[in-house]
């Protein structure tokens, strides 16, 4: 019995892993009954040999609450979540093999020994231990609810080869116990596994993913089909999901996580690490550096240029990643990220706060903003030209278009704001338009018509946007952070124009040619590269 095992002793010494040749250590889970001690052995292999193994993905839980397992005959302490997952998965793996090689993610067996995480692309499959339905565990839910949630997802998914979604109508609208199903699925999605950074790799890169909660199982493919079927059902029937209904809420949350995983799974189809960072920004990590490092392992090309180093602080990690992306891709998408991520006083204005720990666990809409950026052409096909003359300063080559002389809030941010307030806000914008006539750069109707077309497509990110006018009569909109006397720039490698604010560093009192990055913007008449054809002087702009 496990309770009769001696107290956990220090684990046996291991020979160092050959990280230069991408050597990893595998855990062999030995067969046994539920009551038997969890026993394992280890071996080392080279990734280049394409070893076949499964990855165990689980949420750590409280590191101070442990249970003993036998490793190479020695008793060692592991977290209670890992212990429960190994014990629960032992009979599942036994059905496949007499003993099976496993990568138990983030166990003390190899923590710190693996610096490059790209080897997950060779995984045969992965088991995601979402939780347990018995015992004193942090990630626990009643067995009946676990079974009900998995069974409902299986029913929503239907047969893998079926093209019909007729069954979805009954499951979503007429099943008597629908309320109970929704509650059970809510409990399942509340388990810690869904919100952790390090669980993403195991869900994205392997060939097959199995979610396990207690004795219940479901594949990621089935969850994906369930989500697709629900979306197709609402589309085909021309029905609108209840905006605030419990069914809509729980399925939307499921869809959000599945789509986030899908975004990451499309990295070979053109999506890049910036999409990945935003897709999983709501996931949590014990170490804030892992907000970057957990994603980095899924992009081996970038990982070759950026070493995983926990001696660096979060500012260094975020700065290094940005400069790496500019060097590799030749564009300034990272500056856009700096403008939309939460501000951190320890970071220069041009560095994205990629290590930010978001409190809520629902992703936002930044992925759509990145897609919008990718369609831009303000700097034509230029490649970013940058230099880093000193710590905290980024010199960027480009042109200065004009200075902002008037701005007006686009519309109120709250749906509860009275129409009178919105009308007055718009009247202020109309009253400022005569500046355009004085400069003679655009016609009134051209500007209004084009900008209304653009505003129809604005999403929630722009609810706090403002419309501005420059000294030469250019009209555009930008984030609410914009101020009068800010300047509009087109920077080499920047697909959208950027707003900069003249600034000064405290340590450089005599120099006033620094700029703080404010936000990106849209300016009528320069979005197709026109500003680079006006003969404006090319300049280096020093961002701080």
What are these regions (language model features)?
Residues 2-43, 47-54, 62, 67-69, ...:
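Acidic/Ser/Thr/Pro-rich low-complexity tail/linker regions in eukaryotic proteins
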Residues 52, 57, 61-97:
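Acidic, serine/threonine-rich, low-complexity C-terminal transcriptional regulatory domains
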Residues 59, 101, 116:
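Conserved residues at the C-terminal ends of beta-strands
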Residues 94-106, 110-111:
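Low-complexity basic/metal-binding stretches
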């Amino acid at each position: 019995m496990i309770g009769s095992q001696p107290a956990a002793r220090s684990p046996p010494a291991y020979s160092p892993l050959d990280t230069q040749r991408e050597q990893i250590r595998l855990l062999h889970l030995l067969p046994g009954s539920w009551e038997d001690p969890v026993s394992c052995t280890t071996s080392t292999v080279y990734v280049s040999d394409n070893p076949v193994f499964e990855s165990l993905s689980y949420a750590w839980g409280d590191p101070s609450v442990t249970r003993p397992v036998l490793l190479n005959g020695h008793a060692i302490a592991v977290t209670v979540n890992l212990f429960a997952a190994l014990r629960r998965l032992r009979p599942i793996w036994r059905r496949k093999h007499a003993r099976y090689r496993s990568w138990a993610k983030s166990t003390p067996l190899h923590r710190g020994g693996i610096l490059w995480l790209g080897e997950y692309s060779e995984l045969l499959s992965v088991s995601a231990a979402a939780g347990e339905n018995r015992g004193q565990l942090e990630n626990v839910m009643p067995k009946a609810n676990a079974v009900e949630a998995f069974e409902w997802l299986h029913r929503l998914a239907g047969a893998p080869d079926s093209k019909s979604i007729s069954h979805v109508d009954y499951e979503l609208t007429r099943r008597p116990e629908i309320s109970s199903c929704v509650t059970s699925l809510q409990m399942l999605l509340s388990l810690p596994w869904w919100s952790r950074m390090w669980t993403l790799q195991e869900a994205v890169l392997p060939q097959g993913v199995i979610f396990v909660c207690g004795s219940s199982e479901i594949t990621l493919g089935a969850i994906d089909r369930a989500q697709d079927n629900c979306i197709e059902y609402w589309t085909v029937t021309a029905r609108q999901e209840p905006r605030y209904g419990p069914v809509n809420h729980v399925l939307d949350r499921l869809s959000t996580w599945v789509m986030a995983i899908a975004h990451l799974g499309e990295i070979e189809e053109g999506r890049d690490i910036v999409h990945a960072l935003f897709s999983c920004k709501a996931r949590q990590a014990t170490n804030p550096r892992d907000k970057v490092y957990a994603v980095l392992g899924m992009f081996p090309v970038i990982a070759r240029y950026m070493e995983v180093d926990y001696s660096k602080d979060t500012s260094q990690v975020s700065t290094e990643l940005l400069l790496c992306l500019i060097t590799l891709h030749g564009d300034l998408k990272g500056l856009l990220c700096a403008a939309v991520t939460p501000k951190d006083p320890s970071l220069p204005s041009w560095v994205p706060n990629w290590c930010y720990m978001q409190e809520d666990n629902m992703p936002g809409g930044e992925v759509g903003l990145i897609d919008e950026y990718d369609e831009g052409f303000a700097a034509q096909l230029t490649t970013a030209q940058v230099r880093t003359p000193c710590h905290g300063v980024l010199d960027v080559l480009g042109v200065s278009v004009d200075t902002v002389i008037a701005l007006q809030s686009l519309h109120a941010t709250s749906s509860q704001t009275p129409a009178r307030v919105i009308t007055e806000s718009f009247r202020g914008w109309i009253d400022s338009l005569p500046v355009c006539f004085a400069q003679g750069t655009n016609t009134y109707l051209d500007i209004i018509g084009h900008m209304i077309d653009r505003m129809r497509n604005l999403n929630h990110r722009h609810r706090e946007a403002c419309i501005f006018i420059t000294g030469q009569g250019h009209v555009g909109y930008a984030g609410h952070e914009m101020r009068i006397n800010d300047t509009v720039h087109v920077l080499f490698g920047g697909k959208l124009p950027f707003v900069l604010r003249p600034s000064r560093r405290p340590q450089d009192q005599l120099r006033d040619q620094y700029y703080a990055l404010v936000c990106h913007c849209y300016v009528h008449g320069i979005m197709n590269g026109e500003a680079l054809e006006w003969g404006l002087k090319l300049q280096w702009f020093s961002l701080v």
